[in-house]
């Protein structure tokens, strides 16, 4: 898909579309366990947000926003011929889901929030985003992996998961990671949207998520009418990578209930 840039995706399976939106500073490869495990029940499409993975950017110094990412998701759905989709988003991808719901509600069949939150950043968190943007711009991605890598996993991550996380983080261009950080800093607070979401919702959260404690996620899910909440054991902030079997089972059960 070309419009001064290209948006990449990877797909497997057939049938109604189940789309996946990755977190920061990752790419579509984080969903490999879902592409392989859920292709029998849906046409699974893992997207690269602009600048990530195989997707390009249209400026040397990009400026991102959750709304811009949401519009890109809608464009990708157009490109694959999907009027509607079940859409999953992890962490930053969950922030994109909230924007997608506000901007393109007609494209959403159901929402699957994973290891994310509805609240906007606190002043302290916003300052942290700015430090992250400055750090990657000056030092590259290795220091970010060194600080963030151990925090996104649970207590017993496999070497394979750690290696995949490291590869994705180091493959992300510093200017893209910086733009991500500032976009997350500036995202809207979505707590007021929770009781107004009218499509089916599944909220998955790693029991060992140290970045976004599970109790806050459970409380947010409880504000969405009819939402189902599932805790993923042995999962941290990237639960779909750490425990793909439990994640896939929860998603399969949810989709069967629609």
Question: What is each PLM-predicted segment?
Answer:
Residues 89, 93, 97:
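Gly/Ala-rich beta-loop-alpha elbow adjacent to hydrolase catalytic centers
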Residues 121-127, 138-196:
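Conserved alpha/beta-hydrolase catalytic His-Asp/Glu region
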Residues 197, 203-205, 209:
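Short beta-strand/loop motif that positions the catalytic acidic residue
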Residues 98-146:
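Flexible "cap/lid" loop of the alpha/beta hydrolase fold
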Residues 12, 32-39, 45-88, 249:
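Active-site loop/oxyanion-hole signature of alpha/beta-hydrolase fold enzymes
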Residues 1-19, 39-43, 78-83, 171, ...:
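Alpha/beta-hydrolase fold catalytic core
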Residues 227-258:
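Catalytic active-site module of serine/aspartate enzymes centered on a nucleophile-bearing elbow/loop
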Residues 15, 23-26, 91:
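Active-site glycine-rich loops that stabilize anionic/oxyanionic intermediates
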